Amino acid sequence: MSQKNVGKIVQILGPVVDISFAGQKIPAIYNNLELVFENNKYNFEVAQHIGDEVVRTISMVSTNGLSRGLEVIDTGAPIMVPVGKEVLSRMFNVLGQTIDNKGEIEAKEFRSIHASAPSYEEQNDSSEILETGIKVIDLLVPYSKGGKIGLFGGAGVGKTVLVQELINNIATQHGGLSVFAGVGERTREGNDLYHEMIASGVLDKTTLVFGQMNEPPGARMRVALTGLTMAEYFRDKFKQDVLLFIDNIFRFTQAGSEVSALLGRMPSAVGYQPTLATEMGQLQERITSTKNGSITSVQAVYVPADDLTDPAPATTFTHLDAKTVLERNIAALGIYPAIDPLASSSRMLDPLIIGNEHYLVALEVQNILQRFKELQDIIAILGIGELSEEDKKLVFRARKIRNFLSQPFTVAEKFSGKKGKFVPLKETIRSFKEILEGKHDNLPEDAFLYVGSIDEAIEKAKGQSNATTANNNNA
């Protein structure tokens, strides 16, 4: 910084702060401005030039205690965050400052959180399957390595637990590096995740970045960019395949909406910011694979009032390769993960990519579940006895498939008391194929609930049968 550009605060409206640079050079849009007051550092990002040498900024920290007249210094650059191997196994805030009480890091390189997306020439498309070990995903909504994956669901249907299971399954199997960006979610969840990563031994290959729901909208709006910047460096310089987990992308949109209102912009549909599509595009287009390496992103997306047509989830939909929809009605049946196999989709569900056997099994499972859904009204009104023999057989088989799509999670062991299962893709295809062929029509429906492979369902049914026989003998 050759010469310090000093301004003065002239207005404070919550997280929006107006700063006058009278007689000085006006800071550029996105520049990071700093203020040190009573041993606390405050950072502001320039959002607008409003005339009369005044800039309107968004504070990255709470503005409590600030007053007009305080001097602010222009750093001459956007927010710069540390990158490189030094950030692994550490926890950061939106500004790249450590928050894990392990002291500061000695990073050799810093990067701006604002960057352009890779050009068309640099990008690289991949059709390689990313095996998750979760039956319903691997069979019906296969994920691609280097793809963008969305987990859509309302409040309390299991998005965060599913993200944590994916971290556990993919990060432990996957040899590359992982970045987790906690955007506007509960601090408790971040703390749980941190300790789970320590326990599972993946922390040394992971970077955590948090801007939780108690923080100002500026921090929540930018924290995803901080995490993405660190992931991009691993991809471009280390030439690594990187996993980027974002929980929750809706909070990024929500924070942008708050900031937009505070900046005085006219709201668009349902009160969202008029720049919603632009902001989402700027973030999502940077999450891509290049010839150097890949970024595979898993993004939890909160769906307000379970309405998938809401502008926030609807705008996110357009950027994704796989859409995994979590349904409250399935959760109400006690089936977890509560993934809707009919509403979810993936571009990878193609016989040229996944092979003919996998494709035909997945298609048949979807067809049976679709027919079962159509028969629900008839069953509710007339009863199952009024169905044809063929439809009765289909309904019983569909219920077994529905139950078999459930799975015990490793990260939920302490809640469920059931040991988590990782099911290889070949085993998943074999198991569902046998159910479709009617080989297990004689097994009770509840034998298919919360098991891994079909062999476990057979063992469970035997155990139930033996227990029933023993009870009858005792009686």
Curated annotation (Swiss-Prot):
What is the species listed in this Swiss-Prot or TrEMBL entry?
Mycoplasmopsis pulmonis (strain UAB CTIP) (Mycoplasma pulmonis)
| E.C. numbers | 7.1.2.2
NCBIfam families listed in its UniProt record: atpD
**What is the protein's given name?**
ATP synthase subunit beta 1
The similarity comment for this entry is: Belongs to the ATPase alpha/beta chains family.
Q: Where is the signal peptide?
A: none
Q: How does it sit in the membrane?
A: Peripheral membrane protein
**Reactions catalysed according to its record:** ATP + H2O + 4 H(+)(in) = ADP + phosphate + 5 H(+)(out)
